């Protein structure tokens, strides 16, 4: 049984959203079962399209040869990373109706905790 990894993303900033994807893709590439749970402004990472793609930091990161958010999102999908937008977080931030990327679930914290089980949780 592989060790599960849960990534709880509460920040809507580019740096934390980007690194949540770096951690998720890296862990999934190593065979770990990964779930990203985005809440509050962190839900913006899972929007379709994500406004983080237009953040000036995105171009700077890519210009330095680092994979950007679009590449990492695609990698996470390909690697089977589960993506959940927090229902309460969407409501709290006035984001109900935000178009989410295909395959993104809307669920609550209990669903996230159940998915991670006895695994690790990283909060960004």
For every predicted segment, state its role.
Residues 18-30, 36:
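Histidine-anchored nucleotide/phosphate-binding helix
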Residues 34-40, 83-87:
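Short internal beta-strands
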Residues 42-55:
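N-terminal beta-loop-helix "entrance" segment that forms/cooperates
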Residues 84-124:
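N-terminal glycine-rich phosphate/adenylate-binding segment common to multiple enzyme folds
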Residues 54-84:
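A glycine-rich helix N-cap at a beta->alpha junction
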Residues 18, 46-49, 96:
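Short, well-ordered secondary-structure micro-motifs
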Residues 23-27, 75, 112:
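Hydrophobic/aromatic ligand-binding patch that stacks against planar heteroaromatic rings
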């Amino acid at each position: 049984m592989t060790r599960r990894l849960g990534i709880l993303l509460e920040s809507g900033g580019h740096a934390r959203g980007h690194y949540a994807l770096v951690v998720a893709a890296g862990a999934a590439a190593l065979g770990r079962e990964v779930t990203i749970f985005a809440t509050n402004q962190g839900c913006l990472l899972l929007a379709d399209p994500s406004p983080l793609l237009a953040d000036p930091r995105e171009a700077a990161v890519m210009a330095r040869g680092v994979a950007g958010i679009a590449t990492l999102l695609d990698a996470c999908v390909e690697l089977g990373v589960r993506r959940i937008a927090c229902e309460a977080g969407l409501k709290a931030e006035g984001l109900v109706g935000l178009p989410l990327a295909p395959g993104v679930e809307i669920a609550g914290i209990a669903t996230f905790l159940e998915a991670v089980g006895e695994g690790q949780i990283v909060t960004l």
